[in-house]
Amino acid sequence: MLTDPDLKSKVDQIWDKLWTGGLSNPMDAIEQFSFLLFLKRLDESEDDRQRQARLRNQDYKPLVPPEIRWREWTNKEAKDALEYVRTKVFPWLKEMGNEGSSFKQYMQGAEFKINNPRLLIEVCNAIAALKISEQNQDVQGDLYEYLLSKLSIAGRNGQFRTPRHIIRMMVEMREPKPRDRIADLAAGTCGFLVNAYEYILETHTSPDILYDDKGQKQLIGDLLSPEQGEFLQKEAFTAYDNDSGMTMLRIGSMNLMLHGIEHPRFFYMDTLSKEFTDKKSYDLVLMNPPFKGKIAEKVVEGKPEDKSANGKRAKQSAKGKLDLGLELPTNCTKSELLFLHLILRTLDMGGRCAVIVPDGVLFGSSKQHQEIRHKIVEENRLDGVVSMPSGVFQPYAGVSTAVLFFTRGDTTNKIWFYDMEHDGFSLDQKRQPVAENDIPDILTCWKNRFNPDFTTQRAERLSELKSEIAPMKAERLKLLKEINRLTFENAIAPADDEPTRLALESDRQRLAQLHEQMAPLQAEINQLNRQFWVTKAQVKGNKYDLSASRYRQIEQDEPYYESPQVTMERLLKLEYVMAEEVRKLDKLFN
C-alpha cells in the first residue's frame, strides 16, 4: 500500500494532469503513466547495471541505446520531445525484448496516446519528482495499486494486490533456489516472481558487497554460475493471468523487466480452463488467487453457457458440468478451492507452495472444502499455516485470510501454526506503520521450528515471563476487589466523604500503573503463544479444520467476580440507604 502522503499527493497530481490533458479513459491514463514510468526506470536501471558490471569486473553492455534514454529527450522543447517520443522512443519500446518474450508480444498493439506536448513534459517532470529510485522499498507496485484504487477495480472479483511485506514473508519462508521453476498462476503485477528473483540474488551475493555505503542492498548475484544466471533469465519464472486485461499484462511484464528479468514469461491464460495443461511443471508456486466465489451459477436448462459470478461466460458441457482443466473436480465451483487443486497438479513431486486463501477454506463444512483439506493433509505434506488478521488487505477488503505452506507428495505428521495478530501496519483503511509486527517472529520461528534448542529457549522464556507477571496479576485481582468495594461505598457515601473518594482514586491510579507494567510482559507472552504445533490426528478428528483459533490455547486473565454473599449484603445496604432517603424526603413534605 502507498502510505507516504507526499508520494500520494504527487501521484494525484500526475493523475489530474493526464485526466485534464485529454485521457478521459482511466485505463488509458494508467497505461500512459506506466509507459513513461517504465522509461524513467529503464534510465535509472542502466546506471545500476553499469555499477553492477563494475562490481563484477565485467564489461558494461547497454540495454538502452543512449539516444533513447530519458535524459536525452526530456530536456528537449516540448513539441520536439513529443515528436521524438512518437518517432523514436516508443517504436523502440514496442520492439524491446527478445523474440517470444511476453513484453514484446503485448506491446505490439500498444499506442502512445499523449498528444499534448506540454502535458508530456509536465508528466515527465512529475514522474522525475517521485524519485522512486531513492525510496527504501520498491514502490512501483504501490503506485499502480493506488492508481487502480481510483478506478474502484482494485478489489473487483476478489482480486487485489498482495502487500509487499506479506509477499516477502512468503518468499523467505519458501526459500527459492537458483534452479527452481517458479510460477504464479494468477499473477497480477508479478510481485511474487519479482520478490522470488530478488531473494535468489540476495542469497547469492557476496556479503561484502551486499550493501552499499548508504546501507542499500545491491542485488548483484555474483555467486551464481553463468548457467544459473541464464536459467533465471530465460526459464525460471512463469506467470499467468486472465482477469486483469492487457494493460496489467503489460505492467506485469514491465515490472519483471525493471527488476532484471530480461526475458519475461507472463502469459494471458485462464489457468482453470482446459487450455492450460501444465502438469508437474514447477518446483515452487507462489500466489494469491482471486477470491471470486463461484465460477459459474447453476446451469439453466437448454443453455450451453451461463454467466459466472463476475459476468463472464463459463463454458458448460452437455451434461451441465463446468468445462474445467485436467484433474480439476467438475463438482466444485469455488475458485479458491479449484486453485488449490490446480497447484497440486502443476507442482512436481517435492515441489513447494505458499498460497493465500480466505479463511473459509480452512473451516468450510461443504464436501468440496473437506475434500481439498483431506487431500493436502493425507496425500501431501502440509508444512504450515499462518493465520492473518482481517485488515491485511485493507482498504480493498476486510476478509480474513491465511497462508498455506505445503509440499507435493509425502504425508503430514504434524502441522506448524502461527496465529499472526500484527503485520507492522494498522489494520484499518489507513494502514499506517505501527510498532507491533509479528512477521520477524514468524520468520524466526519457521526457520527454527525443528531446532530443539530454540524450542527449549522459547519455553523457558515463557515460563520466566509467567513467573514475573503472576504476582502482578494477583495484585490486580486484589485491586479490582478493593476498587469494587470503594466504588460502592463512594456511591452511597455523603458528598463530603473525602477519604473514600481519595482512596478510590489512588487505587485506580495504581491499577493503571500495574496495567502499564504488565502490558509488555503480556505482549511477549501472547507472541510466544502464537506459534504452536498440531498433530494430524487432531486435525483429522476435527474434519481437517485448519483454523488456528480451533487449536490455539489462549490463557485468559482471571476475571474478578464479587461473591453472591457480598452482593446481597450491598443490595440490602443500598435498600436501607434508599429507605432512609425516602424518610428524609417525607419529613420535608410533612
PLM features: what roles do these ranges have?
Residues 2, 296-335, 359-368, 389-396, ...:
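Short, contiguous acidic/charged loop-to-helix segments that flank catalytic cores in large enzymes
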Residues 3, 10, 25-29, 119, ...:
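Helical mechanochemical/support elements of P-loop NTPase systems and associated helical scaffolds
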Residues 12, 230-234, 262-266, 317-322, ...:
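Short acidic (Asp/Glu) and glycine-rich catalytic loops that position anionic groups and cofactors
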Residues 159-287, 291-303, 357-360, 368-379:
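Conserved S-adenosyl-L-methionine
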Residues 4, 137, 145, 243-250, ...:
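S-adenosylmethionine
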Residues 352-364, 383-437, 441-445, 453-460, ...:
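Substrate-binding/catalytic lobe of Class I Rossmann-like enzymes that use SAM or dcSAM, i.e.
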Residues 1-178, 264-273, 387-391, 413-421, ...:
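Non-catalytic, mostly N-terminal accessory regions of nucleic-acid modification and defense proteins
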